[in-house]
Structure formats: C-alpha cells, structure tokens
Curated annotation (Swiss-Prot):
Organism: Listeria grayi
Lineage, uppermost ranks: Bacteria, Bacillati, Bacillota, Bacilli, Bacillales
Chain coiled-coil ranges: none
UniProt xrefs under SMART domains: RPOLA_N
Gene: rpoC
Entry's family note: Belongs to the RNA polymerase beta' chain family.
Gene Ontology terms describing biological process: DNA-templated transcription
Cofactor: Mg(2+); Zn(2+)
Name of protein: DNA-directed RNA polymerase subunit beta'
Free-text remark on how the cofactor is bound: Binds 1 Mg(2+) ion per subunit.
Length: 1053
C-alpha cells in the first residue's frame, strides 16, 4: 500500500496501457453490479470481490474462510483473498477495449494537445475519431499526402484507382497509427529550424507545437498513449452503491457510465467475432468512443448523458473540478475538529482582547485538556473516569476548565472571510447561556452585527499555534486595517453618539461661565444640577493632569465644557487636551485661544465666543490613529475600551430617542414644488414646438427635479435644530445620512425603473406625510432592484477576489533591496479639479527614489532610498514640491516578488515590512473586500450614448481584465496644442491638434463631454473626452509604465 504521508514530490503523467494493467487486480467483464436478492456482488462485475477485495473484513465471498488467522489466503472455491475490506478503496480494475479510443482531454482540451502533436486541426481530428472521414496513414507510391482527409466517396474512388497501394483508416486506430509513427527528435529539430524563419501566426503555432514536443521528450511519455487500449476502473468504494429503505439502490453516476462502456465494449467484441458488416462495426466503435468520452468528461462533446429526471451524470472530471470538486471541496475545504459555532451577542463589558465563550461549548472544545488536568491533579484515576466526570458535569470540572482556558486563545471567524481581519484571536471568558459574546469594537472588522449572525470558534492546539495566535492574531494587535493603515477598530453607532453628545456645546446652558478649581468640583456641580454637561465653563489648567500645558498655561483658566473634561480623562496623560476637533489640536497642542487670565470676566468672554463643533466619528478615528502613532498597541487598546465604555454610558444617560415629532416638515416645500412644476411645463412646451429633442426634454426635466430636491434638502438642514435627535444621529456619523433625512422630512425625489432608467415622475411626498398609491408603486421598483443587486454583487465580488488572489499569491517580499535605479513619479490623484488622493497620503511609508531637496534653501529633506515618514511627507508638501520620484513595486527588479524598499512600510503594523510577508494576498484582499460595498449599478445620465460610464464593481473588473471599456474615451496620438474645435463634415465635433511635426484631427460625437478646450497643451495618450481609456490603445501610443500609472489611478478611484 502507498505511504500517503511520506513523499518527496508528485508528478502527473500519461499512463501507458502496461501501467494501467499493472495497477489492475483483474478485468471487469460484465456490467452487473450487485445481485438484488443476495445483495452479493456479481462475479466479474463492477463490484466483483475477486478483483477488488472482500466486502467484509477477513471473510471470503462464499464464507469458507472467516477470521484474521486466514489473512492472505486466496479461497479455492470463490477466488477471493481474505483481507481487510478497506482494500476496496484502493484496488483498481481494468477493461480491455475491443477497439482503441481517444482520450477526450487530449483531443478536446484547449489547446488540443493531440492536434498540436499531429499538426492537424481539432475539427479534422473530430471527423476522424467519430468516423466521419478517412485519414491517409500510409500514402505508399500514390499522389496522396500523409494525414490527408478523405470523405467516404473519395475513399471508395481512390480504393478502386490505387487498390492496396495506400492505407487509410478512421477512428482512434488510425490516429494511434499516425502518433506511433511520429519521431519526436526529428520533429523537434524541424520546428526549431522553422522558428528561425517563420512569422506571425505560423510562428506562434510552431512555438506551441514545440512546447508540447519538448514536454513529451522530457517526460518520457509516448504520444500514442493519448489513445486508450485499456480503460482503468476506479475502486468500488469510491463509486459506492448503497441500499435505501424500500429495497431500492442509490448509486454513484460513475457506475452507470462504466456500465454503458462495458455493454458497448462487449457488443463490439461479439460483432467482431461474428464478422459483422463494416458499417455496423464502425457505428459500434463510435458508440464505444462516445461512452468512454462520457465517462471521462460528460458533456464536453455533444449532449451530456442524462440519468433519471434529465440530470446530466457526473463524470470523472466533474468529480475533480470546480467548487464542488475533490480539490476545493474536500482537500482545501475540510471540516476541522476542535471547532464550534453559535449565534453572537454583544459583550460590552469585555476587554479588547476577550470574547465570551458559552460554558457548554468550552467544555466540549477543551475536553482533552480538561481530562489531562483532572488526571494530573489526581481528581480522576484515569482518562476514562475523567471523561465520565466531564459527561456528568461534576462541580470540580468547572474549576479545572477555568484553569485550562486561562491564557489559551481561541480563534473567532465570521463567514464570509473577505480579508485577514475576518479571523482574529481572543482570550475566552466563560459565560452563561449558549451565545458567543463579541466585543463591540471588532464588529467593523468582521462586518458583524447582532441580528442573528453566527460565528465559528477554533482552538489552536500546539504551543506554536497558541503563540502565533497570541502574538499576531490577538484582536488588540489588529487595530490598523492592512489596506490603508487607518484604524479599523473605530467606535460606531451608540459609542459615536455618546461621545458626540458628551462634547456638544450649548449657548446659555445652566451654569455657563462658572469657574471651577478642578474636574472633581465641576463633576460635583454637574451631579447636583448646578451646571449642565454642555455648559461652557472655566477650569484651572494647573489642575488638569496633562503634560502638554506650558508653565504659562498652567497658571491660566482653560475654557471648556464639563463633557470635554470627562472626555479627556480617557486619553493618555501626555496627549494634548482636546478642546476642538482639529488636526492642530490633536497633533500639536491645545490652541492658546482657549486659555484666559484668572482675572478675566469668564461669563462675558464665553458669551462672545462661537460654539465649537462636537467630536464626530471621523475625529474619533483620527484620535485613535494619533494615539496609536505615539503610544502603540497596548495603550491604544486600553484607550479604545475607555472610549467605548464612555460612549455607551453617555448615550444611555442622554436618552436620545426618535419620535414622530422630531421630523419637522418644511414650510417652503409647496412653493418650491410649484416652481419646479412651472419649469417642467415650460420645457414640455418647448418640446411640443420642436425646439428641443425628446432626449433633451427628458434630461432637463430630471435636472429640474434634482435641483428642487437639493433645494429642499439644503433648506431642511438650515432649519434643523442642533439638538434634534435625528440630526444628532446623522451629524455624528452614528447612523443614517442626510438623504435619509430628506426622504423623511423633505421629498423622496426621483426613482429608477427596473431597467435603471430614471422615471421622470418624482415622488414629491415624504415618509412623514405618507406616499400616494402611485408613488408607493414607483418606489417598489427601486427597492426590488436594491435587493437583487446586493445578492448578485456578493457573488461577483467574491469571484473577483478569488481571481485576484490567484494571480497575486506569489508576490512575496523576497529581499531587502533589489538595487534598482528606476522609480515611479507620483503626484496627487485628481479627477477634474477635485483631489481624490493627496500627495502626502501617497508618499507616506514609501522610499524616496532620489534625494529630495527643498527648492529654495536646497537643504536635503530626505536622502535617496530612505523612508518617507509622515513628518517628512508634510515637509515635502510644505516645500511646495508637487511630484516626487519614489521606489515602486512596478519598477522592482526582484525575481518572483518585490523587495522591502520598493514595497514600503507594512500598513497593518505601521512598521517596516518583513521579508516573507505575503503582500500579494494582502493587496488582493484589500481590493476584493470593499468590492462587496461597491455598487453594481451602471449610472445612466439619462441613457445618452457615449455617457454610460461604468462604475463600481463592473469597472474594477473591466480594469483588471483589460477589456475594451464601456463609454470609451478618445485619446490623442500626438503631443501638442489643441488648435481648433469645430463642427465636423459628418456628424460630430472635430478636434484638431497641432503636434511638433504633424497635425491630427479626431471626430467625437456631439453628446460627448469634452475634457479639452482650444489652447490646451496635451501629452500623447491624453483623453480628449470624458470616459475610460482603453489600456491597449494607450500602450500603443505610450510606454508600459504610463499604462501601469493609468490603471493605478483608475483603481484608486
């Protein structure tokens, strides 16, 4: 038997007929399977015990030999060897075919290997194999060519003319004859000679043929083995047959396919023995060929063979390929022991690195550990009694369990695992009930909520696995997102709302302008109702535990609110006191304008100061990032827990609720609608007079309604109170956005119909007033589309991720420095005038390609091949430098991967990337993970031609597949100045560009939106109109690097 676990390497090759016979333990001659009365396998059939081994351990078929003592005896009555029944999983049989058949993989695969070796087209091969044409195998001294195809009629004519002077045949036999005659050495030499001269199509074909020839030579396989004389039969346990209740049998499809082969093969043998007419024999040979094809790969050629209920049968190939095949389903997707799953609920009192594990689950998962501990403590005499104790759930078991799980991390995983933060490690704490408790802050990383989500638990067993889980995978270690280095553990929902409410300021609140000696005094006053949480007050700066205040400031009063005093207690002491949501306050110090002399009249001072914005979600994220930068992981995770607790506590105390009275309708709404109706009336009149086209009318009507909706939205925002609960929820970033609010209180606006075209009848009502029946009906289109899109999008996005991982998985950091002298010049990414990604964000964490000097003082900002930190990036921007040459993975010289310097820093840890880091997979996940959130909709600006610019997920796929994009932009092939834009001779606008040595004109449709005007200076390959550039066109006009840069910029959008 094979030793499955111990091998050096694995090689897959063609099997020769002798090899197949050597695997086999006997020939299968009959199509019978199991006798339905005795339930014993039929002799010489597909389940024969003599060939494949006994059905029962140590027992022959007829029952003459039973027991282990007869091991290895071959029964003289039934011929079955006495051995374990497990051999039925590994013993193979074979079928001796009455005529050779072609293996469909080699004849039908792409490219057809058989066709390449014989230098024939797959079409011709098919005609020969399926007995439609003859092929000349030996031309003799006739004018025929070898491998020439002859029809039935031509064959008869030539037979009469030349008699026995030439040989021609059909079917796999003829092909086998030709394949046997091929001299690989000679063919290889001829092909190499041909490569010297050949061009174009002939050259590519020669290269492909040479590859196959070389492969045959090097592997020692014979081309004629692509034709089968013997068919292997796989072991019966792999294609089982079981009896169901009611006496019926369930069987694997393979048995049906094998039976068809055996039946046809036996019939062919009989016909050959009888000496039947050629036409009948040929037909039978063709049927045998088709039966073998169906067995190996059903449905590859012609209609698949179907079983009961018109279901295509699963052939050998189907068993292996695809998601449900052997590899992806069973070898890569095994079920694992020491795992469990349950519903998750929130655990607000957990620490960042903890999770709550239900007691019963922990007992089952840690069973072996508990049993060992029980025995070693002497609480149980042996493993068996320890097991009994656990099953009875004795009292001492729980104490041992507490001991065992201490410092033993478990892994929590939520499907779908879209990026590496979908599996993290936690220290378990035991909880009552049957639900897993999850820390609220890690929900963002898992994309989890508590509406019934389930999660799986896995126990790392070995010491190494535990160490790895603790050091690399602990939730407290994974604060930054690997895709952009920003914190992924940000407070959400209630936590955001609590901290927002805490840091609000109100005018003329109770106790405004009071002065306190320290935070304790202020808190006593607050508790007793002398001062409000939002009141602006003065506090002696010296009493605040903050190392950032200067000596001067410590003697002054700090103007702040009670809430901000509380908020600042969660931050580390050496962090600036945060009084306003600005970058300056976060990174450098509290602005001096908040300090006043102790002699100041605080009340009047405050009354003249504007209110400061409260801290919204974004600022909380920035605070976390800043704390992480200065204090690293441990301190950050403690601070996060404090922020979470404070947020929950305050949002509970604030008692923010939503009632119908909080939705205030707009007084001016009727007149805005009135105006819009008038405008639409005017546009329709213009259309009736023929002044504008139908398309233009539609566009303008939609424009009018969008403008009306925006006006209502803007007026709504202005009319809202700062303390309106719905406004606070939206403003803080806890939940909802302004358009939800507009739909509640303003108007719902325009809706799209199922095809995605916008219906020009707007929904003028809002949810507060209620919709009319027609409006409700129009709304249902959009809702339905939303649901179907989500379902389709998830599958698409997952498939995109899978393809990305497939191409990027070999990209690993291989060395420290590849020593390249090339780099990539980068500048801020812009879309029109708007900056999508500023230069400093692109620079931070990369290595400089050239030494960068200050343009005025000429001092060195950063040396070449040094890391550009955030501070250096700010200096570069401050010096007014707009483009910088950096080391980039595009220009890295490392073979099979990238080097440290070209990659830059590891965003997930904020430190230098280490050799061996699988950066390709991180990149693939970072693109694939947000794919689920991208929209599927192709936005239509009213369905005008040339304006369907694809966005979202389809656009990303378009870029990676390098397809011809939808809504393609016209690009210029010359560099120069745009001299004129005028109406062309035929439809459209003509743009003329004067280059250095020539002049070119491009015609674009009228509806295209132009990106250039007369006098614009253009580079080669720049777009003249809005839209996506075809990368293949760009590479013709410019170099590879510019295409890489264009694709990079597009993906970043």
């Amino acid at each position: 038997m094979l030793d499955v676990n111990n091998f050096e390497y694995m090689k897959i090759g063609l099997a020769s007929p002798d090899k197949i016979r050597s695997w086999s333990h006997g020939e299968v001659k009959k199509p019978e399977t199991i006798n339905y009365r005795t339930l014993k396998p039929e002799r010489d059939g597909l389940f024969c015990e003599r060939i494949f081994g006994p059905m029962k351990d140590w027992e022959c078929s007829c029952g003459k030999y039973k027991r282990v003592r007869y091991k290895g005896v071959v029964c003289d009555r039934c011929g079955v060897e006495v051995t374990k029944s497990k051999v039925r999983r590994e013993r193979m049989g074979h079928i001796e075919l009455a005529a050779p058949v072609s293996h469909i993989w080699y004849f039908k695969g792409i490219p057809s290997r058989m066709g390449l070796v014989m230098d024939m087209s797959p079409r011709a091969l098919e005609e020969i194999i399926y007995f439609a044409s003859y092929v000349v195998t030996e031309p003799g001294d006739t004018p025929l060519e070898k491998k020439q195809l002859l029809s039935e009629k031509e064959y008869r004519v030539y037979r009469e003319k030349y008699g026995k002077n030439f040989h021609a045949g059909m079917g796999a036999e003829a092909i086998k004859k030709i394949l046997s005659d091929i001299d690989l050495e000679k063919e290889t030499q001829e092909l190499k000679a041909e490569l010297q001269t050949a061009q174009g199509q002939r050259r590519t074909r020669a290269i492909r043929r040479l590859e196959v020839m070389e492969a045959f030579r090097n592997s020692g396989n014979e081309p004629s083995w692509m034709i089968l004389d013997v068919l292997p039969v796989i072991p019966p346990e792999i294609r089982p047959m079981v009896q169901l209740e009611g006496g019926r049998f369930a069987t694997s499809d393979l048995n049906d396919l094998y039976r068809r082969v055996i039946n046809r093969n036996n019939r062919l043998k009989r016909l050959l023995d009888l000496g039947a007419p050629n036409i009948i024999v040929q037909n039978e040979k063709r049927m045998l060929q088709e039966a073998v094809d169906a067995l190996i790969d059903n449905g590859r050629r012609g209609r698949p063979v179907t079983g009961p209920g018109n279901r295509p049968l699963k052939s050998l190939s189907h068993m292996l390929k695809g998601k449900q095949g052997r590899f992806r389903q069973n070898l890569l997707g095994k079920r694992v022991d020491y795992s469990g799953r349950s519903v998750i609920v929130v655990g607000p009192n957990l620490k960042m690195y903890q999770c709550g594990l239900p007691k019963e689950m922990a007992l089952e998962l840690f069973k072996p550990f508990i049993m060992k501990e029980l025995v070693s403590r002497g609480l149980a005499h042996n493993i068996k009694s320890a097991k009994r104790k656990i099953e009875r759930m004795a009292a001492e078991v729980w104490d041992v369990l507490e001991e065992v799980i201490r410092e033993h991390p478990v892994l929590l995983n939520r499907a779908p695992t879209l990026h590496r933060l979908g599996i993290q490690a936690f220290e378990p704490t035991l909880v009552e009930g049957r639900a897993i408790r999850l820390h609220p802050l890690v929900c963002t990383a898992y994309n989890a909520d508590f509406d019934g989500d389930q999660m799986a638990v896995h126990v790392p067993l070995s010491a190494e696995a535990q160490a790895e889980a603790r050091l690399l995978m602990l939730a407290a270690q994974n604060i930054l997102n690997p895709k952009d280095g920003k914190p992924v553990v940000t407070p959400s929902q209630d936590m955001v709302l609590g901290n927002y409410y805490l840091t609000l300021e109100r005018e003329n609140a109770v106790g405004e302008g009071l002065v306190f000696k320290d935070i304790n005094e202020a808190m006593i006053a607050y508790t007793n109702g002398y001062v409000h949480l939002h009141s602006r007050i003065g506090v002696y700066a010296g009493s605040i535990q903050n190392e950032r205040f200067t000596e001067e400031q410590r003697k002054q009063l700090l103007i702040t609110t009670v809430g901000k005093l509380v908020f600042n207690t969660i931050l580390p002491e050496s962090f600036p006191y945060i009084n306003e949501p600005t970058k300056y306050n976060l990174e450098i110090e509290t602005p001096t304008k908040y300090f006043v002399d102790t002699t100041t009249d605080v009340k009047t001072h405050i009354a003249n100061q504007p209110l400061i914005d409260p801290f919204k979600k974004g600022i909380l994220g920035n605070i976390i990032a800043e704390v992480f930068k200065k204090f690293h992981i441990t301190e950050t995770s403690k601070m996060l827990d404090r922020m979470k607790d404070l947020g929950f506590k305050i949002s509970t105390k604030a008692g923010i609720t939503v009632g119908i009275a909080d939705i205030l309708t707009l007084q001016e709404k009727p007149e805005i609608l009135e105006k819009a109706h008038d405008k639409v009336e005017k546009i329709t009149k213009q259309f009736r007079r023929g002044l504008i086209t139908g398309d233009e009318r539609y566009e303008r009507v939609i424009g009018v309604w969008n403008a009306a909706k925006d006006e209502i939205q803007n007026k709504l925002i202005l009319s809202l109170e700062r303390l309106n609960p719905i406004f606070m929820m939206q403003d803080s970033g806890a939940r909802g956005n302004i358009s939800n609010f507009t739909q509640l209180a303003g108007m719902r606006g325009l809706m799209a119909d199922p095809s995605g075209r916008i219906v020009e009848l707007p929904i003028t009502s809002n949810f507060r007033e209620g919709l009319t029946v027609l409006e409700y009906f129009i709304s249902t289109h959009g809702a339905r589309k939303g649901l179907t899109d989500t379902a389709l999008k998830t599958a698409d996005s997952g498939y995109l991720t899978r393809r990305l991982v497939d191409v990027a998985q070999d990209v690993i950091i291989r060395e420290d420095d590849c020593g390249t002298d090339r780099g990539l010049t980068i500048k801020a990414i812009r879309e029109g005038t708007e900056i999508i990604e500023p230069l400093e964000e692109r620079l931070e964490g990369r290595y400089a390609r050239k030494t960068i000097r200050h343009p005025e003082t000429n001092e060195i900002i950063v040396k070449e091949n040094d890391l550009i930190t955030e501070d250096i990036a700010v200096q570069i921007i401050g010096a007014g430098i707009e483009e910088v040459s950096i080391r980039s993975a595009f220009t890295c010289n490392t073979k099979h991967g990238v080097c440290k310097k070209c990659y830059g820093k590891n965003l997930a840890t904020g430190t230098e990337v280490e050799v061996g880091e699988a950066v390709g997979i991180i990149a693939a996940q970072s693109i694939g993970e947000p794919g689920t959130q991208l929209t599927m909709r192709t936005f239509h600006t009213g369905g005008v031609a040339g304006d369907d610019i694809t966005q979202g997920l389809p656009r990303i796929q378009e870029i990676f597949e390098a397809r011809n994009p939808k809504g393609q932009a016209t690009i210029t092939e010359v560099a120069g100045e745009v001299v004129s834009i005028e109406e062309g001779r035929d439809r459209g606008l003509e743009i003329t560009i004067q280059g250095v040595d020539d002049r070119r004109s491009y015609t674009v449709p009228y509806t295209a939106r132009l990106r250039v005007e007369v006098g614009s200076m253009l580079d080669r390959g720049e777009a003249l109109t809005e839209g996506s550039i075809d990368p293949k066109a760009l590479i013709r006009v410019r170099d590879v690097l510019s295409v890489q840069e264009y694709l990079l910029a597009e993906v970043q959008k």
